[in-house]
């Protein structure tokens, strides 16, 4: 069963300031928790477009949202094609967009998907299982320098060089096929004192490989700009991130687009075209309450940022 506990449910959807006859986009349908709550606030004239590139997630979401048939358009696509896919169904402007980034619990909990360092499974990590690049290719075929680069950049792993060197030596003997093999190699490469602190030793490397396989940061950066573009003035975008790399992209995009430009002193008024495109709804990110954390520990690293479109 595709069981998934939705993070920051009310905060994310209520933050969109939902209009009952509005058009909304859920870029990360997943377990459909946010979508279901959003749809419950729409009248029959309201509409939701729901994106997911995971076939299993879409199938379960269609069952879960069966009561709203006719109001939901399901799109199997990476959200980097947000604007194009909306154009294809005749939608150019929307009232709100939401992103809930990171891997959904069912993907983590299904061993054969290869996302989890707790289960031995084939190295995969593709969000879209019809996509080309898999974790197995990254681990076995990418040169040492490229592995160091992604481990450091996407995993913020201080033992990147040691781990990449161990991977290189191991794959010379035979291909690294499973998550279990990779975990053992990582553990061997990290000094014992460091292994005993700071969570699971493979956590950062698995995150780095997953980001590389799915091109997550670039995809999010592109999609966030498209989301802001398709918003009507007064429309809002809610973004939940789970690690500092994504949060940095969201924070800097929102900051850049909500800050007035440097203008010559003495201008009586700011010309309209120089006014910021966005207005921040919350200056500091919203995090999960103690009550939510008791029920869902995965919400611990979640940060929610919301912005409103001020002008075209």
From Swiss-Prot:
It is found in: Cytoplasm. It catalyses: cytidine(1402) in 16S rRNA + S-adenosyl-L-methionine = N(4)-methylcytidine(1402) in 16S rRNA + S-adenosyl-L-homocysteine + H(+). SUPFAM superfamilies: Putative methyltransferase TM0872, insert domain, S-adenosyl-L-methionine-dependent methyltransferases. Its main location: cytoplasm. Its EC number is 2.1.1.199. It is an enzyme of class 2 (transferase). S-adenosyl-L-methionine binds at residues 32-34, 52, 79, 100, 107. Residues 285-312 are annotated as: Disordered. The keyword Phosphoprotein does not apply. The keyword Plastid does not apply. InterPro entries: RsmH, SAM-dep_MeTrfase_MraW_recog, SAM-dependent_MTases_sf. GO terms for cellular component: cytoplasm. Keywords: Cytoplasm, Methyltransferase, rRNA processing, S-adenosyl-L-methionine, Transferase. GO terms for molecular function: rRNA (cytosine-N4-)-methyltransferase activity. One of its GO terms (biological process) is rRNA base methylation. Signal peptide: none annotated. Specifically methylates the N4 position of cytidine in position 1402 (C1402) of 16S rRNA. Belongs to the methyltransferase superfamily. RsmH family. This is Ribosomal RNA small subunit methyltransferase H. It comes from Bacillus licheniformis (strain ATCC 14580 / DSM 13 / JCM 2505 / CCUG 7422 / NBRC 12200 / NCIMB 9375 / NCTC 10341 / NRRL NRS-1264 / Gibson 46).
């Amino acid at each position: 069963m595709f069981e998934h506990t939705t993070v920051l449910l009310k905060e994310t959807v209520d933050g969109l300031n939902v209009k009952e006859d509005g058009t909304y986009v859920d870029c990360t349908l997943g377990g459909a928790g946010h979508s279901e709550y959003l749809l419950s606030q729409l009248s029959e004239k309201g509409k939701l477009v729901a994106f997911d590139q995971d076939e299993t997630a879409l199938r379960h979401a269609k069952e879960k949202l069966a009561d709203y048939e006719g109001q939901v358009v399901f799109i199997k696509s990476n959200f980097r094609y947000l604007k194009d896919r909306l154009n294809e169904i005749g939608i150019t402007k929307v009232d709100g967009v939401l992103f809930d980034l990171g891997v959904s619990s069912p993907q983590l909990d299904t061993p054969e998907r290869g996302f989890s360092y707790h289960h031995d499974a084939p190295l995969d990590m593709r969000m879209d299982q019809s996509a080309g690049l898999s974790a197995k290719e990254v681990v076995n075929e990418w040169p040492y320098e490229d592995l160091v680069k992604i481990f450091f950049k996407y995993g913020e792993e201080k033992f990147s060089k040691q781990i990449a060197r161990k991977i290189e030596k191991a794959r010379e003997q035979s291909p690294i096929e499973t998550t279990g093999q990779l975990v053992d190699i990582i553990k061997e490469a990290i000094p014992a004192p460091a292994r005993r602190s700071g969570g699971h030793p493979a956590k950062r490397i698995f995150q780095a490989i997953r980001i590389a396989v799915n091109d997550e940061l670039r995809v999010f950066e592109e999609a966030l700009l498209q989301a802001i573009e398709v918003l009507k003035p007064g429309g809002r975008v809610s973004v939940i991130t789970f690690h500092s790399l994504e949060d940095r992209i969201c924070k800097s995009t929102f900051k850049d687009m909500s800050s007035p430009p440097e203008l010559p002193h003495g201008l009586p008024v700011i010309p309209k075209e120089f006014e910021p495109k966005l207005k921040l709804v919350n200056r500091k990110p919203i995090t999960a309450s103690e009550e939510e954390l008791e029920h869902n520990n995965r919400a611990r690293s979640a940060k929610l940022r919301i912005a409103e479109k001020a002008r075209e």
